[in-house]
Amino acid sequence: MNYGVLGVIRLALDFIGTKIAFRKSRLIRFPIDIRGRSFIDFGSNLTTGRYCRLEVYPIEHKKGILKIGDNVEINDFVHIAARLSVQIGNNVLIASKVFISDIQHGCYNSNKMFNDCYPDIPPKERSLFAESVFVG
């Protein structure tokens, strides 16, 4: 690939930042937004694109987790959110602009098992639902 002078400088800075902040990773391209880092298990040789978001919001201080396997490649603008458990297996490639999550703000089907699942109720007022997710 031909990165050009500025591309090579940016790549070098990303590599240095990776080795300082994410020692087991292959290359983290900055900026990256990480929330709940203590609940994230990074595998070895992780590669990310730019502008990724990795977030963990545990339920009532229980240990929610985002587990990323070995040799995973996550492209630009990927958003992964976990409340209970999201696991990315080994050797997984995730395309750009992908959203992976184990949480949702209700459903919109004819089975109205929850009273707050109607589209006219704002998402922040609906119950959160979580179910474990595995990609791999």
Per-range role (PLM):
Residues M1-D102, F129-G136:
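Domain-scale signature associated with acetyltransferase and cell-envelope carbohydrate enzymes
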Residues G89, S101-G106, D120, E125:
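Right-handed parallel beta-helix
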